[in-house]
């Protein structure tokens, strides 16, 4: 196990990684997993819930993906940032408050250096979401903001989700990782639905680990079943994600809430 020590001036947690078999895991000073990578396949996605955070691809014609802009609030192990920039060829911006996490991703998780297509910004996700700089410019917004104990979302207010919605283009989508088996999940879902409208919010069934991925569209638009099936096959064949399975475990949250 290797680690980058805590900075006394920031109070941010120690960043370290561990290797178990063929997989490398990112930790923030605890045993909780904050991200992962196959070192011999650094641009693929290892964890199921992180794969599902690419579920927004079902809403988009494949030929349009390369022209879209992605943003991650929370870098983690850089998995989504690497996938969007390297696999999909998207213009990708990641916001991360902890400089040690950025260093760890570059040292241990093969995050490429900044380029015209890839930018890592050291900053506070709440401030970025509230700022006008990126407003209405983001096509897909990944939100995965948990503390070092992974207990509950660090940012989880209606005001924050409203700011996130303002970042999106009219056809944009916010994708959030929540713990579906925790008491906070229902409250988080209620806040997201209040901001985006319940009919524009979709959720995957929880993974075995309890992660539920929620997708919220700025403007509700659902492709026809034939288009969804065609896109799922394209996603599997070209990008190596289990999108056909997604169609069986993804549903509008309004149905589950009885609306």
Residue ranges and their predicted role:
Residues 158-223:
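C-terminal substrate-binding/active-site "lid" region of AdoMet-derived donor-dependent transferases
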Residues 31, 125, 206-208:
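Residues that form or immediately flank small-molecule/cofactor binding pockets and catalytic motifs
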Residues 8, 20, 26, 43-170, ...:
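The AdoMet/dcAdoMet-binding core of the Class I SAM-like
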Residues 31-35, 146-149, 174:
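A short, flexible beta-alpha/helix-coil linker loop
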Residues 127-140, 204, 236-246:
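Short flexible/disordered coil segments
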Residues 89-91, 115-117, 171, 198-200, ...:
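A generic structural signal for alpha->beta connector loops
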Residues 1-19, 25, 33-42, 48, ...:
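SAM/dcSAM-binding transferase cores
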């Amino acid at each position: 196990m290797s680690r980058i020590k805590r900075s006394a001036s920031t109070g941010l947690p120690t960043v370290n990684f561990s290797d178990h078999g063929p997989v490398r895991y990112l930790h923030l000073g605890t045993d909780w997993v904050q991200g992962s990578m196959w070192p011999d396949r650094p641009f693929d996605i290892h964890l199921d819930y992180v794969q599902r955070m690419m579920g927004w691809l079902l809403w988009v014609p494949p030929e349009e993906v390369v022209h879209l802009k992605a943003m991650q609030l929370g870098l983690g192990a850089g998995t989504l940032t690497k996938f969007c920039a390297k696999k999909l060829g998207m213009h990708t911006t990641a916001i991360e408050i902890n400089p040690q996490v950025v260093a760890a991703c570059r040292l241990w998780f093969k995050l490429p250096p900044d380029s015209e297509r890839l930018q890592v910004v050291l900053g506070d996700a709440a401030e970025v979401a509230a700022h006008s700089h990126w407003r209405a410019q983001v096509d897909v917004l990944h939100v995965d903001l948990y503390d070092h104990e992974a207990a509950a979302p660090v940012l989880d207010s209606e005001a924050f989700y409203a700011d996130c919605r303002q970042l999106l283009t009219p056809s944009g989508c916010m994708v959030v990782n929540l713990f579906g088996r925790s008491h906070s999940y229902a409250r988080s879902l209620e806040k997201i639905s209040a901001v985006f409208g319940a009919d524009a919010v979709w959720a995957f069934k929880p993974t075995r680990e309890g992660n539920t991925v929620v997708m919220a569209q700025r403007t509700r638009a659902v492709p026809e079943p034939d288009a969804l099936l065609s896109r799922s096959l394209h996603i599997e064949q070209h990008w190596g994600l289990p999108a056909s399975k997604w169609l069986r475990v993804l549903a509008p949250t309004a149905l589950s809430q009885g609306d």
